[in-house]
């Protein structure tokens, strides 16, 4: 086989298919005046951070600046108290600080519970605002938008709008009962969804008008950050307040179970913890997890036995506010007869007693709530730990010495509030006759008569009248 002449080979190498305009632009040398935008610089910085050692240093510097922008808990109690704890090892110093502020928080919470539903709702809103502020502050630091004052204001505007959408109708009904006024702010209830949507549209248009060239990526990222935070924070606080309306015990018991699980898991892990539980939280141990779960179930049973016969805790809020002296105890809190399990029935036979035990159903409900609080509740904390690790921060804030921010204390409550609401709707809640009557009375007179005639006809068929 004969080789081709060199000249022909050179000609073949020089012949190429015509390039598209896009390819030509990509191959064209960069111009001196072609400067990347702010968003492009961010993307280039991210790629450099992932692919080079120099980028790794830049990443550490950025994370250090982020940590400086977000207050971190140092476990300090002030100069005088710190000097008293100075001789203790850091581990025990942290134990004392955490224990002291745990006692303060539990005492404050107990006082607020005794003041009733209104105080508890204000507490939920206060915690909601602070948790929202902590998460939004992290977003503003990450996307470096502190020099956009209107963006921070927009985030808070969306929070207020979301609260009005979620809480408008229920809180107006509640305050109508408290103030003993019929049709309280009825015009807001009638057009609640329209007003909510109009308020959201104002915020949406304001966001679009605030967009600046070179900051689009950051602004849209924080817009999504804000809405995800609203979904997590506002919706959960809405569920928690709905639980309060069902009776204070549906708020108090789950919250107390989470607190018990946190404390006992910490205690068991502090003294006996050796086996790591999850990489996201290296300090969490299997010993603490199991000890906390067992303690929470026992605590839940004891708490249910202590509160089941107290109308202040078990009556739905609207019924208790209307007539606290004649509140009908819900079925879940009325004593019922249950047969003693066979392995233990022989004890009753020896004592010549009928093998029946009286318990209220809420004792069994408390076991289900305790198991969720101790087994799945901690995953809210693991989720928060993963979030903090993603941004290389230790705490969401420093408002509570020894604990961090409020979000650090209430991360486990997020899942719990939703579970209790789902549990109530699945196993406990029954239609509220007074609420149905109130809705009927808002109808036109002819519609009210139609409902009366239809109801009378159905009751006659069933033989009730």
From Swiss-Prot:
Regions that span the bilayer: 95-117, 121-143, 158-178, 187-207, 214-234, 239-259, 288-308, 367-387
GO terms, biological process: CDP-diacylglycerol biosynthetic process
Enzyme class label: transferase
Record's subcellular location: Membrane
Coiled-coil segments on the chain, per record: none
Membrane topology of this protein: Multi-pass membrane protein
Disruption outcome: Reduced levels of phosphatidylinositol. No effect on two-cell stage nuclear morphology. Significant rescue of the nuclear morphology defects resulting from inhibition of cnep-1 or partial inhibition of lpin-1 but does not rescue the nuclear envelope disassembly defects observed following depletion of npp-12.
Biased composition (Acidic residues): 39-53
EC number of this enzyme: 2.7.7.41
Reactions mediated catalytically: a 1,2-diacyl-sn-glycero-3-phosphate + CTP + H(+) = a CDP-1,2-diacyl-sn-glycerol + diphosphate
Region (Disordered) residue spans: 1-60
CC per GO annotation: endoplasmic reticulum membrane
Record key words, sorted: Lipid biosynthesis, Lipid metabolism, Membrane, Nucleotidyltransferase, Phospholipid biosynthesis, Phospholipid metabolism, Transferase, Transmembrane, Transmembrane helix
Main location: membrane
Annotated family: Belongs to the CDS family.
The protein's name in its UniProt record: Phosphatidate cytidylyltransferase
Gene responsible for this protein: cdgs-1
């Amino acid at each position: 086989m004969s080789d081709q002449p060199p000249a022909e080979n050179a000609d073949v190498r020089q012949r190429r298919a015509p390039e598209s305009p896009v390819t030509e632009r990509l191959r064209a040398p960069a111009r001196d005046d072609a400067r990347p935008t702010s968003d492009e610089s961010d993307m280039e910085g991210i790629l450099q951070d992932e692919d080079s050692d120099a980028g790794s240093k830049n990443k550490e510097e950025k994370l250090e600046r982020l940590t400086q922008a977000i207050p971190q808990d140092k476990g300090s109690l002030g100069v005088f108290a710190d000097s008293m704890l100075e001789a203790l090892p850091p581990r025990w110093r942290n134990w004392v600080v955490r224990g002291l502020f745990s006692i303060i928080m539990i005492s404050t919470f107990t006082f607020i519970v005794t003041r009733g539903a209104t105080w508890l709702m204000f507490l939920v809103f206060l915690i909601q605002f602070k948790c929202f502020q902590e998460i939004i502050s992290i977003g503003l630091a990450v996307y470096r938008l502190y020099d956009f004052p209107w963006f921070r204001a927009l985030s808070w505007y969306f929070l207020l709008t979301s609260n009005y959408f979620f809480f408008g109708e229920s809180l107006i009904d509640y305050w109508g009962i408290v103030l003993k006024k019929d049709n309280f702010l009825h015009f807001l209830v009638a057009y609640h969804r329209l007003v909510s949507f109009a308020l959201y549209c104002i915020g949406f248009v304001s966001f679009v008008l605030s967009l600046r060239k070179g900051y689009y990526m950051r602004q849209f990222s924080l817009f999504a950050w804000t809405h995800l935070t609203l979904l997590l924070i506002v919706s959960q606080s809405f569920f928690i307040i709905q639980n309060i309306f069902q009776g204070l015990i549906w708020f108090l018991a789950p919250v107390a179970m989470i607190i018990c699980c946190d404390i006992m898991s910490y205690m068991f892990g502090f003294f006996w913890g050796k086996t790591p539980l999850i990489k996201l939280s290296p300090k969490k141990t299997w010993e603490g997890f199991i000890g906390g779960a067992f303690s929470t179930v026992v605590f839940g049973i004891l708490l249910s036995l202590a509160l089941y016969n107290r109308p202040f805790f078990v009556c739905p809020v609207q019924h208790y506010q209307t007539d606290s002296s004649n509140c009908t105890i819900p079925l879940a809190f009325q004593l019922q007869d249950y047969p003693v399990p066979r392995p233990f029935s022989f004890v009753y036979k020896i004592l010549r007693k009928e093998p029946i035990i009286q318990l209220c159903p809420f004792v069994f409900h408390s076991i289900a709530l305790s198991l969720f609080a101790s087994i799945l509740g901690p995953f809210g904390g693991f989720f928060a730990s993963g979030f903090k690790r993603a941004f290389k921060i230790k705490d969401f804030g420093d408002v509570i010495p020894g604990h961090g921010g409020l979000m650090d204390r209430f991360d486990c409550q997020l899942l719990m509030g939703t579970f209790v609401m789902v549990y109530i709707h699945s196993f406990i809640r029954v239609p509220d006759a007074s609420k149905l009557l109130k809705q009927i009375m808002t109808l036109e007179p002819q519609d009210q008569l139609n409902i009366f005639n239809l109801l009378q006809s159905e009751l006659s068929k069933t033989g009730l009248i």
